[in-house]
């Protein structure tokens, strides 16, 4: 039996750090259930020992040197970190270099990788055609501007070219042909435009047609049948050809005053001949029997007779 205050003292001693170790009921000193054993402290630690008032600061410093670093956890073999973590933390960190987690192509320099960069367009070299190949291709183009695939393959085997090259050649040749057609059509339109036709010089008419269309002088023409003396005079023009044959001159021409004025014209002789040089006369001799001279004289005589016949009715009246 314990005294009345014993249970409280035992409980207080059990929870105090300076209390002796509580032993098991069997008295085995190896099995300790004290707080020091649970927390892992040893008897060498100065903090667990009794208070030493005479030790001073020197004893406290010696005790601190003896105990070393304080461990709050039970001592045991420390587990090494995984190998991947050890390798990650052992490598030095450099801001300019790429992160170890990123691949080599995804650095911080901002340059895209080879896959992200657009591929350069492969430039094909121009195909150089020989004279024989061009001749055969032109012959095939004359036959058909749009050959089918079988004709192109046959032609490609004949000229020793890929079928793709033959197809491209036909496309380019058709484009050239269309351009030539447009140029020809535009040139024809320009030739047919009224501006150019107006600016062209008129073609010379044939000499025979021109001579036939121009009227001759009245005194050079043949004698006028029918005695139209007034019309044969140099001062009067012949009536147009479109007028009827029964056309008569106006009545005022038959008046006595006009008749009297026209009489001196009939009495006038032929104009004096032109005086030509001796060389010109010798080279081009004048023909005395020229019919034009006789026709002029006969016309004047007929005009005089006509005027006299016109004046006779007035005399009888």
UniProtKB/Swiss-Prot annotation:
Record field: compositional bias (Basic and acidic residues): 108-118
Classification via PANTHER family: HOMEOBOX PROTEIN, PUTATIVE-RELATED, RETINAL HOMEOBOX PROTEIN RX
PROSITE patterns: HOMEOBOX_1 (PS00027), HOMEOBOX_2 (PS50071), OAR (PS50803)
Functional description taken from the UniProt entry: Plays a critical role in eye formation by regulating the initial specification of retinal cells and/or their subsequent proliferation.
Positions of short motif OAR: 294-307
GO MF entries: DNA-binding transcription factor activity, RNA polymerase II-specific; RNA polymerase II cis-regulatory region sequence-specific DNA binding
Motif (Nuclear localization signal): 300-304
SUPFAM superfamilies linked: Homeodomain-like (SSF46689)
An annotated GO cellular component: nucleus
Official protein name in the record: Retinal homeobox protein Rx2
Pfam family, one: Homeodomain
Chain spans, region Disordered: 44-127
Motif Octapeptide motif, residue numbers: 33-40
């Amino acid at each position: 039996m314990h005294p009345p205050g014993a249970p409280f003292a035992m409980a207080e001693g059990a929870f105090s750090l300076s209390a002796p170790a509580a032993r098991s009921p069997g008295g085995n000193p190896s099995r300790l259930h004290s707080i020091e054993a649970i927390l892992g402290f040893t008897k060498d630690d100065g903090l667990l020992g009794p208070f030493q008032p005479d030790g001073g600061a020197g004893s406290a410093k010696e005790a601190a040197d003896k105990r070393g670093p304080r461990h709050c956890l039970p001592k045991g073999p420390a587990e090494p970190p995984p190998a991947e973590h050890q390798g990650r933390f052992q490598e030095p960190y450099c801001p300019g270099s790429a992160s170890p987690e990123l691949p080599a192509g995804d650095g911080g320099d901002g340059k895209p990788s080879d896959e992200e960069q657009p591929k350069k367009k492969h430039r094909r070299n121009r195909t150089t055609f020989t004279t024989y190949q061009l001749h055969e291709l032109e012959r095939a183009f004359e036959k058909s501007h749009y050959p089918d695939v079988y004709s192109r393959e046959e032609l490609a085997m004949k000229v020793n070219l890929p079928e793709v090259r033959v197809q491209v050649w036909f496309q380019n040749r058709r484009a050239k042909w269309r351009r030539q057609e447009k140029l020809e059509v535009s040139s024809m339109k320009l030739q047919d435009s009224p501006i150019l036709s107006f600016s062209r010089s008129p073609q010379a008419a044939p000499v025979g047609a021109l001579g036939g269309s121009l009227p001759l002088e009245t005194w050079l023409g043949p004698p006028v049948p029918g005695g139209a003396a007034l019309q044969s005079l140099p001062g009067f023009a012949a009536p147009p050809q479109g007028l009827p044959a029964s056309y008569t001159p106006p009545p005022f021409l038959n008046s006595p005053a006009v008749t009297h004025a026209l009489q001196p014209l009939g009495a006038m002789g032929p104009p004096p001949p032109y005086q030509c040089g001796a060389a010109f006369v010798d080279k081009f001799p004048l023909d005395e029997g020229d019919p034009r001279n006789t026709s002029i004289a006969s016309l004047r005589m007929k005009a005089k007779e006509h005027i006299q016949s016109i004046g006779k009715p007035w005399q009888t009246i």
